[in-house]
Design a protein with these regions (language model features):
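Ligand-binding pockets and gating/stacking loops
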Residues: 1-434
Length: 434
């Protein structure tokens, strides 16, 4: 027996309020974006190492580290003994050991790393992910910009990942920790008031959506919003989209491969999302176990921090390669800064933006190499300084985005999308571009 969806039952479903603004805004981007000239990369996964790893204890081993350097499968390149699995796959990575950025505390440095700009009380700046989402547009019906997991406590950092004056269309969809029991993306869940019969009768259901919203005021804004909301329903009713967020589709072996903690499951979900069509996914599983080792640096890196990085980053890159996705997916593993070459009184290392390291893989990047040189203690860059603007320009170039582009802000100020030190425009690191 069929139970057709009436206008009344649709209204009782909550007028689509349960969808959440993030889902509707993601869909709205489809109407506002134009695809750029294609590059090798189609998506980005930012493996966010929150808190700032010690570069001299990971990517750029020095004599003032208590951890030994080990050889990799690329002659001449060494990494810390804390990264043995990565060492066996160094041919799949490029290391930048000469990052030089701004911000000596976490809010300043995180804002700078995520937006490319220093904090300015007069205006907010769009994040890297939001710019990429705007410039490239969505693929399929999947949210193009996702942050996983969202911050459960402080929301300050989460704001830095948003689109600012570009508008909510390009904000990330912020979802819960996928490693927690009962993980579910509520924006993709039907309300109890919508019957299964209505879901099974998709055509009639979507017609009911259209009828409901045609009754609204016939303004341009309403018309656009109605279309996006109807698309949101289509997204909910599309199995491929729902499946992208469904980690139960993954085998237990695959979950173990990535790690069943927040770090591993966030990266596994990121892979599922870019596979389905997302443009930019931030895997921020280090929320709860930050790299901010002001005390017991060695113990923290050895026991809590480096092992998940070594396990999960290699699992992600290997998995992408096995699925034929690595060339089209740029993977970036970085935090907001490095850590001091000198150990403090609490056996920790403090913040150090002057010289630090990050790792890249996939996306057409030329791997198996090191860019830049730091001094013997990892305190200063001695060759090939790379600024945040240079990194951004490199990412944009890999994606086929014009890295010289500027946006006009609401206060009439041009904003560079690849902003470098002293308000200069960054330049792509040509050695990284294959």
């Amino acid at each position: 027996m069929q139970h057709p969806t009436t206008r009344r039952s649709f209204v009782n479903a909550g007028s689509l309020g349960f969808l959440g603004l993030s889902l509707r805004n993601a869909l709205a981007a489809e109407a506002a974006s134009k695809l750029p000239a294609p590059g090798k990369a189609k998506s980005v996964i930012l493996f966010w190492l929150e808190g700032g790893p010690s570069h001299i204890d990971t990517w750029d081993p020095k004599t003032n580290s208590n951890f030994k350097p080990i050889s990799t499968n690329v002659p001449g390149i060494h990494v810390s003994e804390l990264l043995p699995t990565i060492a066996k796959r160094m041919d799949k990575f490029a290391l930048v050991r000469s990052m030089h950025t701004r911000g000596t505390d976490h809010p300043q440095a995180t804002h700078y790393a995520i937006t490319g700009h220093e904090i300015n009380p007069a205006m907010q700046f769009p994040s890297l992910g939001s710019i990429i989402t705007k410039e490239m547009g969505p693929r399929n019906a999947v949210p193009p910009h996702v942050l996983v997991p969202k911050w459960d406590r402080s929301r300050q950092y989460e704001e830095y990942f948003r689109a600012a004056f570009l508008g909510g269309d390009y904000d990330p969809m912020c979802i819960p920790d996928p490693a927690k029991p009962g993980f579910q993306v509520t924006d993709l869940s039907l309300p109890k008031s919508v019957s299964q019969a209505a879901v099974e009768s998709r055509s009639a259901f979507l017609k009911a959506v259209d009828r409901r919203y045609r009754e609204l005021n016939d303004t341009a804004d309403h018309t656009n919003m109605d279309a996006f909301t109807a698309q949101a329903w289509k997204m909910i009713l599309t199995p491929a989209v729902r499946d992208a967020f469904d980690l139960s589709k993954e085998s237990d072996k695959m979950k173990e491969r990535y790690g069943k903690d927040s770090i591993g499951q966030s990266c596994l979900l990121a892979r599922r999302l870019v596979e389905a069509g997302s443009r930019f996914v931030t895997a921020a599983g280090y929320h709860g176990t930050s790299w901010d080792t002001h005390s017991d640096n060695d113990k923290g890196h050895r026991d809590r921090l480096a092992p998940p990085l070594d396990r999960t980053l290699t699992a992600l890159v290997d998995d992408l390669e096995e699925r034929g996705l690595l060339e089209s997916t740029l993977v970036i593993a970085m935090g907001e800064f490095g850590r001091t070459p000198i150990i403090n009184a609490n056996l920790g290392r403090d913040h150090w933006p002057n010289c630090w390291s990050l790792a890249l893989s996939g996306g057409g990047i030329k791997t198996g190499q090191v860019i830049g040189v730091s001094d013997e203690r990892g305190a200063n860059v001695v060759d090939r300084v790379v600024t945040m603007g240079d990194l951004y320009a490199t990412i944009y170039q890999a994606l086929g985005i014009d890295w010289k582009k500027e946006y006009m802000s609401p206060i009439g100020r041009p904003v560079k999308i690849a902003n470098s030190l002293d308000d200069k425009t960054g330049s792509p690191v040509k050695e990284l571009l294959a």
